[in-house]
């Protein structure tokens, strides 16, 4: 097995590029087919260094490899003699080592002169070289990704559909549970389905935009096109207007992401569903999901919850029902027993019907005189839409959206004179009671006021500080929502305990799992660290950074709400003798590279330049696919684009991970994070902890052990014994050498993060490291570290004053 993996790895590295696949020139493992200008490449690849081989298309020269199309996603090959060939009947076939057909284009052609070529748009074409006719193309057989000018399609006459189908997981191209498609409604709209149930809906198309995705108007001009031909077929295309390399992908988690490559990294432009309100029908029929902080459901005016007790508990899927039934027949005689209530900033509901109408007034009249019409909207780029069924999947944006007018009984909007008289009488009678109790109430209020004013002022100050910053997309959760999600912070939901305070697992009403960090009053981390983490991480988006969803500031409570990482933190695997066997060398190496990419984004590629100052194993979280996510930005610092060094009078961090210049003088730079990464890298390789490890009589630490191992055997003996069976020795030795370069005493001798990632992703020559001189030794009883670093290290850091 190991020999095969080593052979396969080396074979894949020896890549030879071809211009076309012909009957006499098949494509074998180790060979690639390049587009004319070298934008795309087709070849064999193996996700996550497994034995399974697939034929795929990816962007050439972009690391990590971004696969945009897979031919044999349902049938991998596992032998090194597979090839992709043009058959005598003109079709494209994938053969395994036994020359059995694993995948084919599925059609035969009366052509023996065809060839397969890859265009600069990423489209794989089978072309008849005699006539020049395209016989088959990959753009008509999409996977999980749309490239510019490829398209989704639905032909209602034939039933033919061209859809997006998610991967089963991040590393498994098998079709997953999510499917994206375009409808043939007038106007069309996009859907993501999870199995047979709607998961997300775009809202109807309005000439240049989807009405349920306002960002397509404001931040990413006209990235889509929807066209309908004479046969009624609808085509949805992702256009390339501003970026040379861009894509739309349906992820294995059900997210639809539009990204572009800026020359260094992928930048996220659109990501839906992005919040609670985006999920289909979260508030049920006639329920309105309001994009407040946090998002919440409410009933339209004139409606009440169908199941009031469930509604109070935050279970909104039952929706709402009318308080007063409609009496429609009077409208035609002038007795307006029904009225229309306008609601602004709305994502138009599902189940709409298009009505030919020249103006908003005509749209109103067409609904007014139709007893079954429950609502209408006149939308620029569409015209008149009416609803004859329940209003489902409605959300209200803070900005943007459409005006929806809902039919109500006139009594819901006012009432008759008798009703006004009764109300006036009730008010008069109540006035005396109110005045009589006012004095007593005021006296009690004065007693309580002084006791609570400081808490309110503090809470308001924190909220005002945040609102004065640009924290768009950050939600302010209500304490009640968090309490429901975490089962009142029960011990069963507790994930761990750190210096920040306890961390709890929670589940929101829409089923989304979250992690909640609850600031402890005894924590050394206060308002500065809390605010710092919110302001920094809310402005960052990268696959290798943990995503903050929001916060809660209520009374003395201060909580941070994150996306939940099912595999917790890296230290729970690396330092656990039973679980470390689950992370073989390929997984460890992939995690190492992911962390480096996250640091490069922080240091160089984000719009903020950030030094983390607390990079350590316990601050690396792992999602369900073992992708690493850098977390805990409470100690991070921003620096200006041309300023690569700063200092501080308050030294914060974790013993063992702090660089010499930072621990001794308070000077920090991106090279400080490089040092911390080096320690982390050596921990991941060895499975040993910097704060607990020592060996021989001199009690040498992990850095000294790594140095001696590298000098004696190239670092191969430094590897955790539980990972040796799956390793590539030269790769391990290279990583040990990189780790030693990162922990050099002088910052100038350490690589920056751009150089670091290049070292980890190429086979270029490495500088020779010097023996590391900075070490934190562990005493015999462990007392030096046991009081400073907790066992699980969820958030604990050392604070040293100078």
Curated annotation (Swiss-Prot):
GO terms for molecular function: ATP binding; calmodulin binding; carbohydrate binding; protein serine kinase activity; protein serine/threonine kinase activity; ubiquitin protein ligase binding. The keyword Cytoplasm does not apply. It is found in: Cell membrane. InterPro entries: Bulb-type_lectin_dom, Bulb-type_lectin_dom_sf, EGF-like_dom, Kinase-like_dom_sf, Pan_app, Prot_kinase_dom, S-locus_recpt_kinase_C, S_locus_glycoprot_dom. GO terms for biological process: recognition of pollen. The modification Phosphoserine is found at residues 523, 538, 618, 631, 691. Residues 578-595 are annotated as: CaM-binding. Disulfide bonds join 277-289, 283-297, 363-384, 367-373. The chain crosses the membrane at residues 422-442. Residues 273-309 form the EGF-like domain. Residues 443-802 are cytoplasmic. Residues 328-410 form the PAN domain. SUPFAM superfamilies: alpha-D-mannose-specific plant lectins, Protein kinase-like (PK-like). Residues 20-421 are extracellular. It is a single-pass type I membrane protein. GO terms for cellular component: plasma membrane. Belongs to the protein kinase superfamily. Ser/Thr protein kinase family. This is G-type lectin S-receptor-like serine/threonine-protein kinase At1g61550. It comes from Arabidopsis thaliana (Mouse-ear cress).
